[in-house]
Amino acid sequence: MFQRVYDVILERKNYSPDNSYVASLMDKGMDSILKKIGEESAEVILAAKNENRKEQIHEITDLWFHLLILMGYQEITIEDISQELKKRFGQSGLEEKVQR
């Protein structure tokens, strides 16, 4: 599903900002994308504090969507993220941190 959404984001990147939320956000640039990610991150935190599972799922989905927009804007692929996760799989977070 992530790849499908990412592919649509890449497609919408070329749409008119008047006709696409993704295109309009990308047209506004990095600061607008990052601001939206910050807003969505805060909403995830509030939903988690409220311990409302349905709200958390909704807000996490919004955050992931906006992270995918950032990835499309920066030309970071799903495969790039997958490869990074594969490198980290099987080692503790502390080991991974030391290797950075």
Predicted regions and their residues:
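Flexible "arm" and connector segments at domain edges
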Residues: 1-60, 64-100
